[in-house]
Amino acid sequence: NTKQVKAAAILNDAFAAAGAAGSNPGGDGVSLINTQHPLQTGGFLANRLATDADLNETSLEQSLIDIADFRDERGLRTAIQGMKLIVPRQLQFTANRLMESTLRTSTADNDINAIRNMGVIPQGYTVNHYLNDADAFFIKTDAPNGFKHFTRTPLKTVMEGDFDTGNIRYKARERYSFGFSDPRCVFG
């Protein structure tokens, strides 16, 4: 359970301002989800909506449009695409309606569900039960060198008997870390 909590902390702290409690700024000095990721040639990369919005058809479509407009360090468009929608347990029903409905949700029109029809989120959605913010949603992209998980020392367990008490002593040890290298790996 500890490993899942630490992995989810990357997204739970994704909006925390640098220097704030729980912040985990990237190499550019700003939080993972931010509108002010500096680019080497000037300007900024935004991997969040300009205005915070709840998960709905409009916010999801705008997020995908913004992902398609990601720029590299030279200011050129990349071919990065959204791959998977990540939601907390509180948004699982909304995510299911948005991703699986044949027709548009929350409308009387008989329009197709463009998100599903176009297959713009090919890996669908997943519910992460360790996310703390009930209305935050994330789109994992196919950006290379994004999220990181390093296992420095694999899990090792040791069990031995205590001669004096007859009790069995058991210990486990492992070293790992979670992080990110490229903020283009996620949009939130």
What are these regions (language model features)?
Residues N1-A21, L85, Y170-A172:
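Long, contiguous amphipathic alpha-helices that act as assembly "spine/axial" helices in icosahedral shell
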Residues I33-D69, A79-K84, Q90-G188:
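Sequence/fold signature of self-assembling virion shell proteins
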Residues R71-R74:
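Short aromatic-glycine motifs in intrinsically disordered, low-complexity regions
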Residues F15-G42:
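Active-site cradle of extracellular carbohydrate-active enzymes
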